[in-house]
Amino acid sequence: MADSVDRVFVHALNTVKKIPKTGASRPPPTDRLRLYGLYKQAMEGDVDGVMERPTAASGLASDELQREKDKWDAWNLQKGLSRTESKRRYIEALIDTMHRYATTPDAEELVSELEFVWNQIKDNSPSSSLSSPRPNQSTGAGAQQPQQEPEQASDGEGPLKELRPMSEYDEAELRSQRQVDLEDDEVDVPTSDRSSGRWQRKVERALTTMSAEVAALREQIMTGREWRTKKERSVPAWVKWFAWLLVKHIFADLVILSVVLLWLRKRKDQRLEDIVRAGVRLMREYVRNVLPSRG
């Protein structure tokens, strides 16, 4: 189910881009920092090894330095979460935040569509305890890590846990991590070979990202069709359709009646015109009797 979570995560990021800049209430800094931390954890993993906590030695202004520290702390609060679990929490936090602060009709429709997509898969997606194990970054034989991790889990925690198969996205990450470990171990490899391996890893990551975006776009198109079908089958949609159909028929009847009256008047035949005048006279009398008099 990690692929489904990835698709909804991309859908959530697109939803954030589509939120109107005017009219909607801005969430408080605590909510924005929590979303930022979950986003960075989902995209890059733990903050350790990626960047250090900003200090005064970085040369930033006091206000900007405090903002960078808050961002780093928000990211560090999500330490230890897998990428799939971070994406799940980001989606749920975004839906909750938009329900509280998205007050415009466009924003409400965006969060309703995102929640509709998320409800379809969240009950079937595994929790973080059942997600695929993250590759260990310690030095050593990287190719033997997938076989060693189930044994460590069984020795350290007693009962065996159910491990689901890794998704294509996780397998691509594992292959990239293996290449990084092999590059670190093989010191005697020529520079040209290491450059080609680094280039190959970048290409694989780009292909993986492109595949996820294409799958997310396909999911978004299918979801949009389902959403439109659901709205078209609602009671207000049926009422609007019936009212529009009635107006079209009345307009068409009036046009046909006008053409027939003109044709008969040209032939000096006033029978139909007399019938129409009598009908209009009866309608006026009925309206005069129903509506209260002005006096």
Curated annotation (Swiss-Prot):
Membrane topology term: Single-pass membrane protein
Record: glycosylation sites: 136
Pfam (any one): ACBP
Listed Low complexity bias regions: 125-153
InterPro entries reported for this sequence: Acyl-CoA-binding_protein (IPR000582), Acyl-CoA-binding_sf (IPR035984), FERM/acyl-CoA-bd_prot_sf (IPR014352)
Every ACB domain range: 5-103
Keyword Glycoprotein tagged: yes
Region of interest (Disordered), ranges: 124-162, 174-201
Gene Ontology annotations for the cellular component aspect, listed alphabetically: peroxisomal membrane
GO biological process: autophagy; fatty acid metabolic process; protein transport
Transmembrane stretches, start-end: 244-264
MF terms (GO), sorted A to Z: fatty-acyl-CoA binding
Chief location of this protein within or outside the cell: membrane
Keyword terms of this UniProt record: Autophagy, Glycoprotein, Lipid-binding, Membrane, Peroxisome, Protein transport, Transmembrane, Transmembrane helix, Transport
Subcellular location: Peroxisome membrane
Knockout or disruption consequences: Does not significantly decrease the growth rate under nutrient-rich conditions.
Domain of life: Eukaryota
Known function: Acyl-CoA binding protein which acts as the peroxisome receptor for pexophagy. Required for both micropexophagy and macropexophagy, but not for the cytoplasm to vacuole transport (Cvt) or autophagy pathways. Required for functional micropexophagic apparatus (MIPA) and relocation of ATG11 to the peroxisome-sequestering arms of the vacuole. Binds palmitoyl-CoA but not oleyl-CoA.
Membership in a protein family: Belongs to the ATG37 family.
Protein name per Swiss-Prot or TrEMBL: Autophagy-related protein 37
Lineage of source species: Eukaryota, Fungi, Dikarya, Ascomycota, Pezizomycotina
